Amino acid sequence: MTSTVESLSSVKKKISFEIPADRVTSEIDKVFEKIRKRAAIKGFRKGKAPQSLIEKHYADVMEGDVLKNLFEETYFKALAEHKIFPVSHPVIDSDEIKRGTPFTYSATVEVLPEIDVKDYNGLEVAKETFTPDESIVEKRLQEMRENMSHLRSLEEGSVAEDGHFAVIDFTGYVDGVPFEGGSAESYQLELGSGRFIPGFEEQIVGMKTGESKSMSLNFPEDYWNKDLAGKEARFDVILSEIKVKELPELNDEFAAQMGEFDTITQLRDKIAELYEKQENDRIKADLQDRVVQALIEKNEIEVPSTLVDRQLQTMLANAQNRLAQQRLTFEMMGMNEESFKAQYRTVAENQVKGSLLLEAVAKKEGISVEEADIEKKLLEIAGGNEEELGRVKSFYEQNRAARENLVAHLAEEKVMSFLLGSAVISEKTKE
């Protein structure tokens, strides 16, 4: 067997193979003999059919087995010989396999690019400055009040207003026929929330408890359910109850219910402290993203599409999980998997580029993760608790993938710290 390598690009190689005729014939005979022993052809005892008939009936099976055997014998040997480390499955292009004829085929694979990273010292990046925002504290307090609120039923004959919670029975019809998902009993709807199609909540405003109404509405043209989009519908609605939300007062008593706080001032201060920490964490992540982007701009590299596709798939799964937690789907957001991938492909490509460039900097600068780095991180994960540390260590010892991810994260942190150490950082206010 002979093999040659052609570089199609910095991330794609084509390996061409030629297998001698005698080796091809030998493999065909070996595969034929295995098939002959189990071949069941009408009119012949098993293993007794003539070769020409067996080859006619089992041609596809024979060719597949021969190709598989020759591939496994030559492909991995060539990878080792040429020191090729694929990140993708091979794309095979082959000639027809014939007795007494040399067999040629090619395997095209993607590989990591060889990166000579440069200009990574003194990267110029802008860092956002943290600015306290009292309105955020007030917003968080209001959210806490909302969480501690309760609903009080209004007396019979009350009139529904914007902001009230209406308890309704309803049935929706399209072309006079109830449609799937268009009915419910004792459904609690906050008027003005915009949860229903335009016009639905507005027509409940002004109704009295015990009142019924039939309303005509049109589904929006861009409605997530394409079977209903743009169609006219009738809803029969009965308003059975009206509730009003009552919020607790912002006082020391409220603060005490939120934890170990004696006064509302202490609670405000804690919220402000947590907000500052969250913002500083966000600012840090944003700065690191800017460093990676600056590194990419200084080092234009090609990356394997296989790695980009994998990153996209991870991003897709994460997005679907986040939506599922909110009981939403891509379709409800006017998207699908293909449109998501098209929208975020450049983001995924830059993430792959950034990861490879950070690895290249680490290699060039001799930055590595020591056992002491791992011990320190494990103790941090354990919250500084020596007893908990044992359980944390046990988890990472038994989960190889988790440990590899931890080491990769630590390596990235060390490289980022190195790059930030030489970066030229300018301050900027939040946009």
Swiss-Prot record:
<dbReference type="InterPro" id="IPR008881">
    <property type="entry name" value="Trigger_fac_ribosome-bd_bac"/>
</dbReference>
<keyword id="KW-0143">Chaperone</keyword>
<dbReference type="GO" id="GO:0061077">
    <property type="term" value="P:chaperone-mediated protein folding"/>
</dbReference>
<dbReference type="GO" id="GO:0051301">
    <property type="term" value="P:cell division"/>
</dbReference>
<dbReference type="Pfam" id="PF05697">
    <property type="entry name" value="Trigger_N"/>
</dbReference>
<dbReference type="InterPro" id="IPR046357">
    <property type="entry name" value="PPIase_dom_sf"/>
</dbReference>
<dbReference type="Pfam" id="PF05698">
    <property type="entry name" value="Trigger_C"/>
</dbReference>
<keyword id="KW-0132">Cell division</keyword>
<dbReference type="InterPro" id="IPR001179">
    <property type="entry name" value="PPIase_FKBP_dom"/>
</dbReference>
<dbReference type="GO" id="GO:0003755">
    <property type="term" value="F:peptidyl-prolyl cis-trans isomerase activity"/>
</dbReference>
<dbReference type="InterPro" id="IPR027304">
    <property type="entry name" value="Trigger_fact/SurA_dom_sf"/>
</dbReference>
<keyword id="KW-0697">Rotamase</keyword>
<dbReference type="InterPro" id="IPR037041">
    <property type="entry name" value="Trigger_fac_C_sf"/>
</dbReference>
<dbReference type="Pfam" id="PF00254">
    <property type="entry name" value="FKBP_C"/>
</dbReference>
<dbReference type="InterPro" id="IPR005215">
    <property type="entry name" value="Trig_fac"/>
</dbReference>
<feature type="domain" description="PPIase FKBP-type">
    <location>
        <begin position="163"/>
        <end position="248"/>
    </location>
</feature>
<dbReference type="GO" id="GO:0043022">
    <property type="term" value="F:ribosome binding"/>
</dbReference>
<dbReference type="GO" id="GO:0015031">
    <property type="term" value="P:protein transport"/>
</dbReference>
<comment type="similarity">
    <text>Belongs to the FKBP-type PPIase family. Tig subfamily.</text>
</comment>
<protein>
    <recommendedName>
        <fullName>Trigger factor</fullName>
        <ecNumber>5.2.1.8</ecNumber>
    </recommendedName>
</protein>
<comment type="function">
    <text>Involved in protein export. Acts as a chaperone by maintaining the newly synthesized protein in an open conformation. Functions as a peptidyl-prolyl cis-trans isomerase.</text>
</comment>
<keyword id="KW-0413">Isomerase</keyword>
<dbReference type="GO" id="GO:0044183">
    <property type="term" value="F:protein folding chaperone"/>
</dbReference>
<dbReference type="InterPro" id="IPR036611">
    <property type="entry name" value="Trigger_fac_ribosome-bd_sf"/>
</dbReference>
<dbReference type="GO" id="GO:0005737">
    <property type="term" value="C:cytoplasm"/>
</dbReference>
<dbReference type="InterPro" id="IPR008880">
    <property type="entry name" value="Trigger_fac_C"/>
</dbReference>
<keyword id="KW-0131">Cell cycle</keyword>
<dbReference type="GO" id="GO:0051083">
    <property type="term" value="P:'de novo' cotranslational protein folding"/>
</dbReference>
<keyword id="KW-0963">Cytoplasm</keyword>
<dbReference type="GO" id="GO:0043335">
    <property type="term" value="P:protein unfolding"/>
</dbReference>
